[in-house]
Regions:
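N-terminal helix-turn-helix DNA-binding module of bacterial transcription factors
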Residues: 1-61, 74
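Short beta-strand segments enriched in small/hydrophobic residues
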Residues: 18-21, 55-71, 81, 170, ...
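Hinge/beta->alpha junction and helix N-cap segments in small-molecule ligand-binding domains
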Residues: 68-77, 95-104, 156-166, 182-230, ...
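Short helix-capping segments at alpha-helix termini
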Residues: 88-89, 202-209, 235-237, 260-265
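Short acidic capping loops at alpha-helix termini that bridge into adjacent secondary structure
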Residues: 177-178, 209-213, 265-270
Length: 331
């Protein structure tokens, strides 16, 4: 027997009219009531039939932007690109922070899509695997992945491999000896591509790859870089330079610790980062780094998702942007 509004109302201890208002995304309903009604509707399997059919033609005039960490400077710059687009848009941009939890990311998108609270979604730095991203493809709401290439969804990304090749080439040409590489152990495609670029550069220059020169951090923070510095310096491989695909904040932490130990950067120890965050220019010495076109990524993403929503772009589209190697004083 089909589930009715009355069934949901009785379980939620509200009126059928209230349930109808929630399902149709009407205002003047408390968030607590809305969440309770929607949870019961989902529990009773109401979404796949009545809600989906009833709301299929309704627009929310909203674009959901799902991020893994709203405190990240990298994410903030992409968001600035989304917000500063030259295009006049009739959509509200809604931000959702999943704090890097892939289950939350998937469940959040499903809920927003099925409740028709968004017309499209932008995933920035998604931690979900390609297999799991099928969930996003199977919903009726268009979705774009930013900062990583994705074969099953539209994506806007940078050529991470080439960026790492340029950075490693530069350090090799400085004849700095062993070059350490600091990566983030949170395995994802961009980080794997950056590590691959490091390896390719070594190979092209006839330098053997040494696993002992790979160091891992848990996140792109200054504290992680400070903690990593002693591990690099005390390593039997004795590196005299480090390339930091993990990000600029780790590189800055390394520079700070080097200065505290009276090690001269870049004379005694060269440091190259990845991202070109605003802090890269402020640190002394200023950080040599790989610049990612974060504003451009955001701008391309918002324009592409609008074209998808409004039916102007139907084919899969993958936009690759190039990095730029920025030489400053740390290497």
């Amino acid at each position: 027997m089909p589930v009715t509004l009355k069934d949901i109302a009785e379980r939620a201890n509200v009126t059928s009219a209230t349930v109808s208002m929630v399902i149709n995304n009407k205002p003047h309903i408390s968030e607590e009531t809305r969440e309770k009604v929607l949870a019961i509707a989902q529990e009773l399997n109401y979404y796949p039939n009545a809600i989906a059919r009833g709301l299929a033609t309704r627009k929310a005039n909203a674009i959901g932007v799902i991020v893994p960490n709203l405190a990240s400077s990298y994410v903030v710059r992409i968001l600035q690109g989304i917000k500063s687009t030259n295009r006049d848009i009739d959509y509200t941009v809604q931000l959702f922070d999943t704090i890097g939890q892939k289950e939350t990311e998937t469940q959040l998108f499903q809920r927003l899509a099925r409740e028709r609270r968004i017309d499209g979604a932008i995933l920035i730095g998604s931690v979900v695997s390609e297999k799991e991203l099928k969930v996003f493809r199977d919903e009726s709401v268009p979705c774009i992945v930013v900062a990583r290439k994705c074969d099953i969804l539209d994506s806007v990304f940078v050529n991470n491999t080439q960026g790492s090749i340029e950075a490693t080439d530069y350090l090799i040409k400085l004849k700095k000896g062993n070059i350490a590489c600091a990566v983030c152990y949170k395995k994802n495609l961009p980080m794997e591509e950056r590590l691959e670029g490091y390896k390719l550069s070594l190979k092209r220059h006839g330098v053997s790859f040494d696993e002992n020169l790979i160091f891992e951090v848990s996140d792109d923070t200054m504290a992680e870089g400070e903690a990593l510095f002693s591990k690099i310096i005390e390593s039997p491989t004795k590196p005299s330079a480090v390339f930091v695909p993990a990000g600029d904040m780790v590189a800055i932490g390394i520079i700070k610790m080097a200065k505290r130990t009276d090690m001269r950067v870049p004379d005694d120890f060269a440091v190259v980062g990845y991202d070109d965050l605003p802090a890269a220019e402020v640190i002394e010495p200023a950080l040599t780094t790989v610049r990612q076109p974060k504003l451009e990524m955001g701008d391309h993403a918002i324009n592409l998702i609008i074209d998808k929503i409004e039916g102007r772009e139907t084919a899969f589209k993958h936009k690759e942007l190039l990095t730029k190697f920025i030489v400053r004083d740390s290497a």
